């Protein structure tokens, strides 16, 4: 199976600066690759990391990202442009796991070849799920998050 994993705009993978989501998906990507799946992870460019490399069977693609800010509107703007950069770079796959806000709003409709869209709702949603269409699966890490979706 071909699996793409899209991280947020502000941290790299493999994790070099924290990030529970980044650590979790990094470990899962390694497990998927060890099981014989073709895995591509998209994350932020980071000093000392090449833009493209393959580690333990996982292909890493690092794109221009931004630092996380204390302003929600600015983070949403960064996320929108991050989603657009990833959208243009995504290879054909069977599934694409998305860990950002804007990309799922248009990915399933505009690029079905990217794969069935799976979202991990790692935080309490703020209304973005109303904008999502053609989502194959939403993963909720807790009952509280599931009820808010």
PLM regions: where:
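N-terminal strand-loop element at the rim of the active site
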Residues: 9-13, 31-73
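Nucleotide-activated donor-dependent transferases that construct or modify glycoconjugates
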Residues: 1-18
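Structural alpha-helical scaffold elements that stabilize or flank donor/cofactor-binding regions
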Residues: 89, 131-132
């Amino acid at each position: 199976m071909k699996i793409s994993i899209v991280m947020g705009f502000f941290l790299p993978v493999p994790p070099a600066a924290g990030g529970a989501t980044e650590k979790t998906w990094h470990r899962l990507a390694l497990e998927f690759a060890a099981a014989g799946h073709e895995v591509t992870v998209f994350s932020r460019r980071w000093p000392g990391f090449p833009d493209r490399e393959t580690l333990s069977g996982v292909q890493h693609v690092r794109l221009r990202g931004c630092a996380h800010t204390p302003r929600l509107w600015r983070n949403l703007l960064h996320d929108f442009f991050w989603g657009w950069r990833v959208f243009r770079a995504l290879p054909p796959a069977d599934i694409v796991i998305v860990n950002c806000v804007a990309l799922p709003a248009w990915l399933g409709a505009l690029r079905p070849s990217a794969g069935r869209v799976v979202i991990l709702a790692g935080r309490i949603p703020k209304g973005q799920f109303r904008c999502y269409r053609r989502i194959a699966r939403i993963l909720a890490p807790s009952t509280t998050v599931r009820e808010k979706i």
